[in-house]
Swiss-Prot record:
Compartments where located: Nucleus
An annotated Gene Ontology molecular function: zinc ion binding
Name the record gives this protein: Structure-specific endonuclease subunit SLX1
E.C. number(s) listed in UniProt: 3.1.-.-
Keyword Nuclease applies: yes
Cofactor: a divalent metal cation
Gene name, Swiss-Prot/TrEMBL: SLX1
Record's compositionally biased regions (Acidic residues): 465-475
Function: Catalytic subunit of the SLX1-SLX4 structure-specific endonuclease that resolves DNA secondary structures generated during DNA repair and recombination. Has endonuclease activity towards branched DNA substrates, introducing single-strand cuts in duplex DNA close to junctions with ss-DNA.
Enzyme class: hydrolase
Superkingdom, natural source: Eukaryota
Keywords: DNA damage, DNA recombination, DNA repair, Endonuclease, Hydrolase, Metal-binding, Nuclease, Nucleus, Zinc, Zinc-finger
Basic and acidic residues composition bias: residue spans: 359-396, 438-455
Length: 487
């Protein structure tokens, strides 16, 4: 292997979330603005990003671990506003960086009359004020590329919301008057060339990011009245009628055999690829089940766009911003269509995964049941074999087979049949007290008989042992007689 190959193999590689089918539309990812409440008039602020603002504010305030080191001082912190609706985590991180460093961002530049580009914001003493941070967020949302995204802004107090409203009234009114001078702008709050698009959702949520203030019912329209943290799982949209409900209805029609086609081109739709078609995502349009190819819908939105929103042929817009639904004729953001497509795809994949897991679980249970059944059958067969063996053994015992106690002359228990013995030596009653023991060879070669005498009743037990078991078969004799004790 060459050195170049080794370098290539050892090189750390990363996968983009935007390539190879890895991209997802996150349910929720927000950039947020914090303000320190350590003092009454504190101007310290902090900008960050997170998929879970209620948890993140607790981390910053030390209630949970993994808070930012720079916010460990000047606690407590209060969340002023969040910007969310980003189509990817990467887009949110780009917005966060530009919000933190507006004097370096290429997105926050404007062209003067001399065709020179100038930064709207400079690094001065007011760069961390709440007013400046709100103005930077407003400028980012009003300029490309973020003005093409389906973003939403949520405020958690009247003060920050009022700053936004005052900036909105000033934006687009003042024009940049510049010659060849490169003098820095004095007041960047007045240097915005255009205002935020009306389609951007502006929400005042007095319940706070954690929903514990008890003031949520005083909010503007568009905020849920019940208490609790903000919805970071996007359940209301993803599980609502506009996404899940309409797809279930379309699925029923597909299973019933209906031939569903694109509303615009009348061509067939590949319903197994959820990123190639769209269903009207408006929950308020209960009767609209308009299905279109995404490409057809994009062309339709571009063709139907107002004249003032169109660009010259030399600078065409690749993607539309919003348009009218071909069926219900209501305004829908392009980003809302894409968001619904990814939500639908995720739900279908989760359902398929759960179905596969359920089938695998059933198969595993069936396999275990089959093994248990086989084991039970084997156990029953074994019991039958043991029962037959017990019956055979009982029959042998009833025919004269007995079990003899262990002999004092033999190291192993002895089983003998009268007249046919496999033992080398057996004492008929070894528990009897012995007075005298005599042995002699009787009955032929290799057979030795011994007597055991009891003085109390004069009973003599006679045993025999075989010296060579392989050459002669032992013979057993029991004699009982009353006689005088041997002297």
């Amino acid at each position: 292997m060459s050195d170049d190959a080794e370098v290539t193999n050892n090189k750390k590689t990363t996968k983009s979330t935007l390539l190879d089918g890895n991209h997802i539309f996150p349910p929720f990812y927000a950039c947020y603005l914090l303000r320190s409440k350590a003092t009454a008039n504190s101007n310290r602020t902090y900008v960050g990003s997170t998929p879970d603002p209620p948890r993140r504010i607790r981390q910053h305030n030390g209630e949970l671990k993994q808070g930012a080191w720079s916010t460990s001082r000047h606690r407590p912190w209060e969340m002023q506003m969040i910007v969310y609706g980003f189509p990817s985590k990467l887009a949110a991180l780009q917005f966060e960086w530009a919000w933190q460093k507006p004097e370096l961002s290429r997105h926050l530049r404007i062209r003067g009359e001399d065709q020179e580009y100038y930064h709207i914001f400079t690094k001065d003493a007011r760069r961390n004020w709440v007013e400046r941070k709100v103005c930077v967020a407003y400028a980012l949302i009003s300029l490309t590329p973020f003005n093409r995204l389906p973003l939403h802004v949520r405020f958690f107090n009247h003060e920050t919301h009022g700053i936004w409203q005052s900036i909105h009234e000033q934006a687009g009114v003042n024009t940049i008057q510049r010659g060849k001078s490169r003098a820095k702008p004095v007041n960047p709050l007045h240097l915005l060339s255009q205002s935020v698009a009306p389609a951007v959702t502006i929400i005042l949520d007095l319940g706070g990011v954690s929903g514990t203030s008890g003031k949520r019912r005083e909010c503007t329209k568009g905020v849920m009245s019940h208490e609790g943290p903000i919805d970071v799982k996007d359940v209301e949209f993803r599980q609502g009628f506009g996404v899940r409900g309409k797809w279930l209805e379309i699925r029923k029609r597909i299973l019933s055999g209906q031939d569903l086609c694109c509303h615009l081109c009348q061509e067939r739709i590949a319903f197994n690829d959820h990123l190639t078609f769209s269903i009207c995502p408006l929950a308020e349009s209960q009767d609209c089940f308009c299905i279109t190819h995404l490409i057809c819908l994009a062309k339709h939105f571009q063709d139907e766009a107002p004249v003032e929103d169109r660009r010259a042929p030399s600078q065409p817009k690749i993607l539309p911003y919003q348009g009218l639904c071909p069926n219900c004729k209501r305004t829908v953001q392009w980003g809302q269509h894409i968001r619904a497509c990814y939500a639908r795809k995720e739900q279908v994949e989760k359902a398929e995964k759960a179905e596969k897991a359920e089938k695998a679980e059933k198969a595993e249970k069936a396999e275990k049941a089959e093994k248990a059944e086989k084991a039970e059958k084997a156990e029953k067969a074994g019991r039958k074999v043991r029962q037959r063996e017990m019956k055979t053994k009982k029959g042998d015992q009833s025919n004269g087979t007995v079990a003899q106690p262990e002999s004092i002359y033999s190291a192993t228990p002895v089983h003998t049949t009268f007249g046919l013995s496999n033992a080398s030596a057996t004492l008929i009653d070894p528990s009897m007290p012995a007075r005298s023991m005599k042995s002699k060879d009787v009955g032929g070669e290799g057979i030795r008989h011994s007597t055991h005498t009891d003085d109390s009743d004069g009973i003599i037990s006679v045993y025999s042992e075989t010296e060579d078991e392989s050459e002669s078969e032992p013979e057993w004799e029991i004699f009982e007689a009353e006689m005088m004790a041997l002297s």
